[in-house]
Amino acid sequence: MGVPRPDGFFGNCDPKNKKNYRTRCSALIKIRNNMNILIDTAPDLRQQLLRHNIKNIDKVFYSHMHADQTHGINDLRSFYLKDKKQINIFADITTSKYLKKNFSYCFNSFSKEYPATLKLNLLKKKITINNNSNKITIRSLKVKHGKVDSTCFILNNKLAYISDISDFYKKDFKFFKNLDYFIIDCLWYEFHPSHFNLEKSLYYVKMFKPKKTILTNLSPVLDYKVLKKMLPKNVIPAHDGLTLNL
């Protein structure tokens, strides 16, 4: 949803605090030697790319098919126009079908003037990406997200990125224990059928014992400063532009 909402509603968030201005969730993985991997194409993607001066996108991983994860996809076209190279997209079967149905022009060449700009690849459980002497391993795991599944991503067995979740599958608990970083959905205080609330996020923080936790996907209900005061020392609210080093 972002903060403020399109109607200007800040909810409980103090508009004087810059960390309360939130775009929809996307994450950028920067690998040395200028490789950029994007997780999700939020509707605010153009704004995010310009703000952080991103000049290339090499690969995109999708967590699921919802609009707030996919509807910035058209902004990837600019990088094709610049480099004349299709961008590799990775998505599960459900998300792939949604993307091909709703954004077919991205994946099919209709004319010389409108070539396919993206190449769709089926998401595997584990992918290793090499960039000269640097490499990153991305493990993809399903989590519950209301009536559908979402995909979370674990980078080099150190960082988990889970933007949308209503619960974990118990069989995968072992992958989330003792991570360096645990980036987890936390919509608001009350129960929600498709997202974690604060209580549930902190329940799993206590169970998995990461070194540091970042709460993301925060609604206008959650003011940055108020929320931060409520949290344990190793848990912080996310904010736009937050950078972590692995």
Predicted regions and their residues:
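Binuclear metal-dependent hydrolase catalytic cores
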Residues: M1-I162, K171, K228-L246
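Catalytic metal-binding/acid-base residues of hydrolase active sites
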Residues: D44, H66, S166, L187, ...
